[in-house]
Amino acid sequence: MGLMHVVVMGVTGSGKTTVAKGIAQARQLEFIDGDDLHPAASVAKMSAGTPLTDEDRWPWLDLVGEWLQERPRAVVACSALKREYRDRLRAMAPGTVFIHLAAPHSVLAARVEKRLTDEGHFAGPDLLASQFEALQPLGFDEPGGVIDVSTASPTEVMEVALELVDALDV
């Protein structure tokens, strides 16, 4: 087993943290939720429903990349919405693969609203539309895969995610 860097990506409410934690546990990888690396100013901005700009994101992405770089086998939950964000992470941690959790806006809006009510998560429904606008799907040349989480059960999503990780582990 060599280096293994996995980024579970997608818009808010897609299940990134749950899936990344499951992968970490099942494959003995270190885990971090990329949200935990956001500076307080960015969290405050998102809590107010203000989308982050690229300028807000670059320092955060650098922290995510550094975290991956320092660990031989790790998984991170990180939105990684744009190709240039993913390119930056790959430049810092070569060989990083991306698992994109995808679902329509309508499905995720209900999840985000519930999470906001139940858990008080900082990313509310106001951010969802801007994240969908920013989202650039994985390119054909980007290592990784896409999982449709709109109708699959959490167990099914995890099974597919683990199959992807195993197939991508070099």
What are these regions (language model features)?
Residues K21-G65, V112:
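Conserved substrate/cofactor phosphate-moiety recognition/catalytic segment
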Residues T53-P94, L101:
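Glycine-rich phosphate-binding loop used to anchor ATP phosphates in small-molecule kinases
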Residues K16:
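Conserved lysine of the Walker
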Residues D118-V160:
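Small-molecule kinase domains that catalyze NTP-dependent phosphoryl transfer to phosphate-bearing small molecules
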Residues V8:
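Hydrophobic anchor at the beta1->P-loop junction of P-loop NTPases
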Residues H5:
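Walker A (P-loop) ATP-phosphate-binding motif of ABC ATPase nucleotide-binding domains
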Residues V11:
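P-loop (Walker A) phosphate-binding loop of NTP-binding proteins
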Residues M92-V112:
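Conserved phosphate-donor/acceptor-positioning beta-strand/loop module used by diverse small-molecule
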